[in-house]
Amino acid sequence: MARIAGINIPPHQHTEIGLTAIYGIGRTRARKICEACGIAYSKKVKELTDADLEKIRDQIAQFTIEGDLRRETTMNIKRLMDIGCYRGFRHRRGLPMRGQRTRTNARTRKGPRKGAAALKK
């Protein structure tokens, strides 16, 4: 089993799909990494040699991924909340921040409905 950036890459998947198991790497970035390393996207992860894996690790080291990316995202949201801007306010309240309506819909962001009895109290 290939281990890249502290993540076990599923061996039965194609390289392009397997790399998406790493947080911060999607299909497009995975494809570009494969191109830069000279590896076919359709090659299975278990078929990769140690040299191929090392090339992939070197390419991935150039990007912000996993814990660093999660930390950066969290800090960006925290900064928005600290400066008191509209987006930070919406994050704090758990509401959509990109102008969507909230009178109806927005259930994903607001959570499950509260019954009429809960609202009267």
Curated annotation (Swiss-Prot):
Give a GO biological-process term. Answer: translation
Instruction: Quote the subunit structure annotation.
Output: Part of the 30S ribosomal subunit. Forms a loose heterodimer with protein S19. Forms two bridges to the 50S subunit in the 70S ribosome.
Matching entries from InterPro entries are given as: Rbsml_uS13_C (IPR027437), Ribosomal_uS13 (IPR001892), Ribosomal_uS13-like_H2TH (IPR010979), Ribosomal_uS13_bac-type (IPR019980), Ribosomal_uS13_CS (IPR018269)
Which spans are transmembrane here? none
Specify whether Glycosyltransferase is a keyword of the entry: no
Please report which protein family the annotation says this sequence is part of.
Belongs to the universal ribosomal protein uS13 family.
| MF (Gene Ontology) | rRNA binding; structural constituent of ribosome; tRNA binding
- Protein's recorded name: Small ribosomal subunit protein uS13
Q: Name the UniProt key words of this record, in alphabetical order.
A: Ribonucleoprotein, Ribosomal protein, RNA-binding, rRNA-binding, tRNA-binding
Task: State what this protein does.
Answer: Located at the top of the head of the 30S subunit, it contacts several helices of the 16S rRNA. In the 70S ribosome it contacts the 23S rRNA (bridge B1a) and protein L5 of the 50S subunit (bridge B1b), connecting the 2 subunits; these bridges are implicated in subunit movement. Contacts the tRNAs in the A and P-sites.
Asked if the record carries the keyword 4Fe-4S, the reply is: no
